């Protein structure tokens, strides 16, 4: 359950410019996700039932997006290490199943994340990103969601 060294390198190179401005990019991604998939906001206690305008104005937006991008950074940094990825994916899936979040919500993320990264002029790595999110989706399915 990991990426090849070449795939991990591609993901790392495309992620670097995104993570370099993680606060603004994290907020932008989360808002884009909620605009495209409004129901996903309901999986976050701070955003449940709120409009995009309310979420954008929320002081919690930065906290949530920062946690998400920090966690994603851990996956990126360990993407080629099968042992670490297996443990991280298992823990991640267990936590998210506990929140009621399943593979469908991460399929939504998977469907738009490569284009989001590309929109920031990051090097393309669509197939590698799809594989990384595929590992997350598979872990959630294995955990029952």
Swiss-Prot record:
Q: What GO molecular-function term can you cite, just one?
A: oxidoreductase activity
The residue ranges of the Globin domain are 2-145
Record's miscellaneous remark: This molluscan globin lacks one of the heme-binding histidine residues found in most other globins.
Give the family from UniProt.
Belongs to the globin family.
Among InterPro entries, the record links this protein to: Erythrocruorin, Globin, Globin-like_sf, Globin/Proto, Globin_lamprey/hagfish, Mb-like_M
| GO cellular component annotations of the record | extracellular region; hemoglobin complex
Instruction: Give the binding site residues for heme b.
Output: 96
Q: Which domain of life is it from?
A: Eukaryota
Q: Which residues carry this modification: N-acetylserine?
A: 2
Q: Which organism is it from?
A: Aplysia kurodai (Kuroda's sea hare)
**Sorted alphabetically, which Pfam families does this protein's record hold?**
Globin
What are the UniProt keywords, alphabetically?
Answer: Acetylation, Heme, Iron, Metal-binding, Muscle protein, Oxygen transport, Transport
Q: Which residues cross the membrane?
A: none
Assembly behavior: Monomer.
**Protein's recorded name:** Globin
């Amino acid at each position: 359950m990991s990426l090849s060294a070449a795939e991990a390198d591609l993901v790392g190179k495309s992620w670097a410019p995104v993570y370099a401005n993680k606060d603004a990019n994290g907020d932008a991604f989360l808002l884009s996700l909620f605009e495209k998939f409004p129901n996903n906001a309901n999986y976050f206690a701070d955003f449940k039932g709120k409009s995009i305008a309310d979420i954008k104005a929320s002081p919690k937006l930065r906290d949530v997006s920062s946690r998400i991008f920090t966690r994603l950074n851990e996956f990126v940094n360990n993407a080629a290490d099968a042992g670490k990825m297996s443990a991280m994916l298992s823990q991640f899936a267990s936590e998210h199943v506990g929140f009621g979040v399943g593979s469908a919500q991460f399929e939504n993320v998977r469907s738009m994340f490569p284009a989001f990264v590309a929109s920031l002029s990051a090097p393309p790595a669509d197939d590698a990103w799809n594989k990384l999110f595929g590992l997350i989706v598979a872990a959630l399915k294995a955990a029952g969601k």
